[in-house]
């Protein structure tokens, strides 16, 4: 029996357009899987239309901002897609933020509607006291279901311009307030099509991204490809990361692609009995968002021999992936973040925007249809980011003779000691390879002789038997030039992190009375 294709309200360049097409072509195929349940494409498309109409009935229109404060769930995805279908701008909110921080996102974005998880109701209520512009609230696990059930399922007749904003993704600021990166419909779809073409995804790819909450760009970008290809996005419930539960999910749902940050992969490969599990469904295993040691990458390759190990590099402002390392290159060029993805131009430049010689360190700048339109309401920051017609990443890299890129550090996270530049990532990578080190952060502290001196803050693998400063010093002496050696070592139980999991070097500098005023990576 033929199934009528639902009305497509955009120009083919929105996520909601693609959802409607798949609802017509494969209505009974799973679009979402979550906690043992799911939504077919027909069910998801109808619920998205109903929710879009429910928001419209409450005064939300094209260009209005709809904030979403929710734990991972199918309803969060439905709200994202409903906002897109309506032509509104979706504002994902980090569910780990306190009320004051949530209020800032609501007021800075100018949100008029808020869809909030019932579990986060107290935070939302306090935040709304500081955000009077929010006049519409729907609660996941509460009146949202009533609103969806009461709304019409008739297709919306709204044309959405693909060059208009789809999402405002707030970077997780570690100094000062976060900035909202404005991503258009075109930004996101070009990213999806570039990624799936580059990696060879297929409609039967089932993807789990437990390492990336849905408020994070990696959660959004990780879920869009299967939905736009007619595949299935498998969602893991929010909460503390459980490597055993993650492997259970892969086996149960036959996940083919999965993304985790390095610390999570380290926990996964250490699960007892992992070799006895049926993980044959995995086709691609990816990491990103933080540096991974070469030791961990080799372990991943050995643990999942049937899967392609992929290094994904980028940032929120770029939708987010700009460079990929895959296949045999994961071994041949281990330590690299790869080469530019399809539809991404890169240069490696100095402060005067001159291309640096091959092998020299410079800032990587981008030009791409995937790069954000602007920082929301911040024209000066936008102009600075796009100086010279290229987007300035703030990442310092070098490029080898084959065009492969290697991240050296963040541009503003560098220690200058005795006139020599010490790139923190290089020293951290060496120390992270020590068998007694779980994680490490390098910071600069004031030094009467050299101006700044490197200090390594180390979290040991075994707190009961941490490595000594003498052992760590000997390790570095064998692997680093002398000026790069940490002058001091501080042993701690764990490194402080922001809500997105990035190490808070500002907190470490404050604790150790460091003199550096640099900012932490925002994404």
What does each model-identified segment do?
Residues 12, 27-28, 152-170, 177, ...:
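Conserved pre-ATP/AMP-binding loop-to-beta segment of ANL
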Residues 53, 57-58, 85-149:
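Structural core segment of the AMP-binding/adenylate-forming
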Residues 70, 91-104, 118-123, 231-252, ...:
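ATP-dependent adenylate-forming carboxylate-activation enzymes
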Residues 97, 114-116, 258, 352, ...:
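AMP-binding/adenylate-forming catalytic core of the ANL superfamily
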Residues 255-259, 269-332, 345:
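Gly/Ser/Thr-rich phosphate-binding loop
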């Amino acid at each position: 029996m033929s199934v009528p294709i639902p009305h497509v309200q955009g120009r083919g360049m929105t996520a909601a357009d693609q959802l409607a097409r798949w609802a017509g072509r494969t209505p009974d195929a799973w679009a979402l899987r979550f906690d043992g349940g799911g939504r077919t494409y027909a069910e998801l498309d109808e619920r998205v239309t109903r929710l879009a109409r429910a928001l419209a009935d409450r005064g939300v229109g094209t260009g209005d901002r709809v904030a979403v404060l929710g734990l991972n769930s199918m309803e969060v995805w439905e709200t994202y897609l409903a906002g897109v279908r309506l032509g509104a701008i979706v504002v994902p909110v980090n569910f780990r933020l306190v009320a004051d921080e949530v209020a800032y996102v609501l007021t800075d974005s100018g949100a008029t509607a808020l869809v909030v998880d019932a579990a986060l109701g107290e935070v939302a209520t306090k935040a709304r006291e500081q955000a009077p512009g929010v006049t519409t609230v729907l609660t996941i696990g509460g009146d949202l279901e009533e609103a969806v059930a009461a709304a019409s399922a008739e297709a919306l007749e709204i044309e959405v311009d693909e060059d208009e904003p789809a999402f405002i993704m707030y970077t997780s600021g570690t100094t000062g307030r976060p900035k909202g990166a404005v991503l258009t419909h075109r930004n996101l779809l070009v990213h999806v099509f570039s990624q799936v073409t580059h990696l060879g995804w297929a409609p039967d790819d089932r993807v789990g991204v437990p390492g990336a909450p849905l408020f994070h760009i990696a959660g959004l970008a990780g879920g869009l490809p299967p939905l736009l290809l007619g595949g299935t996005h498998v969602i893991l419930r929010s909460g503390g990361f459980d490597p055993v539960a993650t492997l259970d999910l892969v086996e149960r749902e036959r996940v083919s692609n999965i993304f985790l940050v390095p610390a999570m992969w380290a926990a996964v490969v250490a699960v007892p009995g992992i070799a006895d599990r049926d993980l044959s469904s995995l086709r691609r295993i990816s990491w990103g968002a933080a540096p991974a040691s070469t030791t961990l990458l080799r372990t991943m390759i050995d643990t999942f021999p049937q899967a392609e190990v992929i290094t994904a590099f980028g940032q929120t402002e770029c939708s987010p992936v700009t460079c990929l390392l895959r296949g045999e290159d994961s071994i041949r060029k281990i330590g690299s973040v790869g080469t530019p993805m399809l539809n991404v131009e890169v240069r490696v430049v100095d402060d005067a925007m001159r291309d640096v010689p091959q092998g020299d360190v410079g800032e990587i700048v981008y030009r791409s249809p995937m790069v954000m339109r602007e920082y929301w309401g911040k024209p000066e920051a936008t102009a600075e980011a796009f100086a010279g017609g290229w987007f300035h990443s703030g990442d310092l890299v070098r490029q080898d003779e084959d065009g492969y890129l290697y991240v050296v550090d963040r541009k503003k996270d560098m220690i200058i000691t005795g006139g020599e530049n010490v790139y923190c990532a290089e020293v951290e990578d060496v120390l992270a390879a020590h068998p007694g080190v779980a994680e490490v952060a390098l910071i600069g502290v004031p030094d009467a002789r050299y101006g700044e001196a490197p200090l390594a803050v180390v979290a040991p693998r075994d707190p009961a038997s941490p490595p000594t400063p003498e052992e760590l010093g000997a390790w570095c002496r064998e692997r680093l030039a002398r000026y790069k050696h940490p002058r001091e070592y501080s042993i701690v139980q764990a490194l402080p992190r922001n809500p997105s999991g990035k190490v808070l070097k500002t907190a470490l500098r404050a604790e150790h009375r460091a003199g550096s005023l640099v900012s932490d990576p925002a994404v």
